[in-house]
Amino acid sequence: MENVYENSYMIVGIFLLLGILLPVVALTLGKLLRPHKPSEAKNTTYESGIEPYHDANVRFHARYYIFALLFVIFDVETLFLYPWAVAYDKLGLFALIEMLIFVAMLLIGLAYAWKKKVLQWL
């Protein structure tokens, strides 16, 4: 039985090694084989063939980051809910209660953010 586990870890190790090695080799070969001829035109910002007329660095309001953070939180919630939903019949009532508590905590946080008017634009 130990041989099966060692073989599984070896396969994971090979995939990890290839996952790191292949992009590094491809990027290195691309850098070595491409022609290097820098020019002023190549270093300008390209906006659909039009010369840029102002600085591309624009400051975003902090509320955008709050919405992005909320999106990430609820996206991670989906990562937790999907495996639970797939294996629901094997996990039983205890896992159902745990997931309900998890979702309830997220909904309480969302209600708190809504009450504090974090989700309003103006």
From Swiss-Prot:
InterPro entries: NAD(P)H_OxRDtase_bac/plastid (IPR023043), NADH_UbQ/plastoQ_OxRdtase_su3 (IPR000440), NDAH_ubi_oxred_su3_sf (IPR038430). It is a multi-pass membrane protein. Keywords: Cell membrane, Membrane, NAD, Quinone, Translocase, Transmembrane, Transmembrane helix, Transport. This is NADH-quinone oxidoreductase subunit A. NDH-1 is composed of 14 different subunits. Subunits NuoA, H, J, K, L, M, N constitute the membrane sector of the complex. The keyword Acyltransferase does not apply. The keyword Membrane applies. Belongs to the complex I subunit 3 family. Its EC number is 7.1.1.-. It catalyses: a quinone + NADH + 5 H(+)(in) = a quinol + NAD(+) + 4 H(+)(out). NCBIfam families: PRK07756.1 (NF005839). It is found in: Cell membrane. Its main location: membrane. GO terms for cellular component: NADH dehydrogenase complex; plasma membrane. NDH-1 shuttles electrons from NADH, via FMN and iron-sulfur (Fe-S) centers, to quinones in the respiratory chain. The immediate electron acceptor for the enzyme in this species is believed to be a menaquinone. Couples the redox reaction to proton translocation (for every two electrons transferred, four hydrogen ions are translocated across the cytoplasmic membrane), and thus conserves the redox energy in a proton gradient. One of its GO terms (molecular function) is quinone binding. The chain crosses the membrane at residues 10-30, 66-86, 91-111. It comes from the Bacteria.
